[in-house]
Amino acid sequence: MKKMKAIRYYAPQDIRYEEVDIQQPGDNEVLVRIQAALTCGTDVKTFRRGHPVLIKKTPSGFGHEFAGIVEQVGNNVVDFKPGDRVVAANSAPCGKCFYCLKKQYNLCENLDLLNGAYAEFITVPERIVQKNLLKIPTGLSFEKAAFAEPLANVVHGVERTGIQPGDTVGVVGIGPIGLMFARLAKLKGANVIAAGRNPLKLKLAKDFANADEVIDLKKYQHPEKIFKSFTQDGRGLDVAVECVGLPEIWEKMFSLVRKGGKVHLFGGCKSGTTVNLDTRRLHYDEVQIISVFH
């Protein structure tokens, strides 16, 4: 059997660069030669502390955002051929379970998951081939195409949030996800305030996301005052989006929004994490909480 180089996940903070067998595609599967693989916040969290959903058993393939070239297809595959440029989501719903029938596909009870992008090849299973393997348009690079999966997560988050033209939206945490959230909110017609600490990302919040205001959180002990200063009569944000995944940031988000505002908790915290919330604020000010599993 042919071999390839791959990063394998064994345990939190234990990943290994190894030579492993290339998994030959079954009749309904596709073997892809990786051309670009990204590292997202979920990969970093998984490396640091594991993951309750992505890693079912160890050792496991690692990495889940990728684009590449079809190397080989199974006997029954007709929609793809060797040489096709493709990108895939790392999951696909069953379409039959309780949640799928309610069209909550990301909550599927039998979600098919795919890890192994940090390798020379990856074998895409049947369900993902059928539902979430896509050809890359001519002119789009592998590096940009690999953003399809995280961008889809953000699109889902923006749709669930219900951002309207003219809303004032604050995004806290401007890594790749936060930057895409800010950019899409801007495209929705919102006034966008982006906040973070990294100078490079603060610059990207302006240059890439076109944020109306950018806040360097290192400079302010009470950033909620700065956010509110950019809103009508200092009432607070229409929507506040958390893209960090830390409980102390979750708790602070509720001080940023106006009465009737929305707090979107997009960044996932460690399993078992609890937070303290001001119940008076939630109840009497009718603050809405949205939390999206991508």
Predicted features along the sequence, with ranges:
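Glycine-rich beta-strand-centered segment in the early N-terminal region that forms part
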Residues: 23-37, 51-98, 135-139
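Conserved beta-strand positions in the Rossmann-like core of class I SAM-dependent methyltransferases
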Residues: 71, 193, 264
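NAD(P)H dinucleotide-binding glycine-rich loop of Rossmann-like/cofactor-binding domains
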Residues: 94-172
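Adenosine-nucleotide cofactor-binding segment
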Residues: 138, 171, 186-252, 272
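Hydrophobic/small residue at the entry helix of a nucleotide-binding pocket
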Residues: 153, 177, 201
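Glycine-rich adenosine-cofactor-binding loop
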Residues: 167-185
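Glycine-rich phosphate-binding loop and adjacent beta-alpha segment
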Residues: 247-294
